[in-house]
Amino acid sequence: MGLVSLRNFFVLSLALNVSLILRAINQNEKLHSGALMAVEKGAKVAQMTFLSFPSLSSPSAAAPETQTPLGRERVVNLDHGDPTMYEQYWKPMGDKTTIVIPGWQSMSYFSDVTNLCWFMEPEFAKQIVRIHKVVGNAVTEGRHIVVGTGSSQLLLAALYALSPQDSSNPISVVSAAPYYSSYPLMTDCVKSGIHKWAGDAKIFDKDEPYIELVTSPNNPDGFVRHPMVNRTGGILVHDLAYYWPQYTPISTPADNDLSLFTVSKSTGHAGLRIGWALVKDVEVAKRMIKFIELNTIGVSKDSQLRAAKVLEVVSDSCEQAGGSEYTESFFHFSHTVMTERWRLLREAVKRSGLFSLPNFSPAHCNFFDNNLGTQPAFAWLKCDKDNVEDCESFLRGHKILTRGGKHFGVGSKYVRISMLDREQTYNLFIERLSQIRS
């Protein structure tokens, strides 16, 4: 009897386990099917909404850019300045910018303890000096180089270093409108109490110390900028992210107390998150370094080493252009692409008849040794249609995402449009803009 009961129990247990297993498999299939449907649905939405950010691991990202049937329904996102245009140059370069970093390398916090900026890789500092000498866009002699996680961190470090530490009131930070849209947000982000955003430099009239951010060429409108306030007690920070030959004529080496640069817009490697500052005053440099030390305990060595290699290749391409290694320099290639993009944009604006763009006077470029026009990284577009007050919303209705003028301290008739996206995205934008009629 006991044997029968034990056998019955075993059979019953086995039946229950099989039932549970089958139920689990069934539920898993339903969940997988539902998840797959959700992913497919989400992928379609993402594909429609973010044309500028395809997955780099997907076959479509590696394949040549072609117009798909869905292209006309896609939203062209040119709100941001993601410099993927430069992939056209770097892909054919092959292994020229490839570096190998062994697992034991870059383990220490310290890069060069003999350098004021102790976390800066010596090779990166060397290539910074070299690229400025090759291009002729900045004086490096008598300057301390400070590396940062992009020029954004360096701007915050500069504000920290230049703000009085013993004042009962925060120092005012200004920039002439239209100013870079992130300046107000960055200045007031942590509400530090040592500095505050005070708006448009053109209307700043307080008789007190101030910091003026001078962006030249300017983001968003592309014009060459000079200080606006020009009063006693003023401190200047020059943001020169776009002072490179593909965007503007290089007229003279920048000789400022504090200048900011970044690889994001110079070479297109925004993902490296690397920038640098050229600082004349050693005490200001020390305080900037202290900020970065407190903020991130230095800057990624791996990114610095890769950035150094990229800058080295750019300099090599300039010095060896026309040879067997480099048929043309990086800046010649980039300038040609920007020239064509601006030509297409001006033609599209003319055909539409609803918009206008800034006009730039040609100037002599020492790098190209020629008189050239300005072709900024962003287009500052104005909607001239009488019944359209919000150009950003108007273009959104035509599936074009831009950044409206209110973010830059001016009216909503203006928008900023990135000129640096991939060719497929840019061509779709031009096609769509050309078709807008009154």
Question: Locations of the language-model features?
Answer:
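PLP-dependent class I/II
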Residues: G2-S438
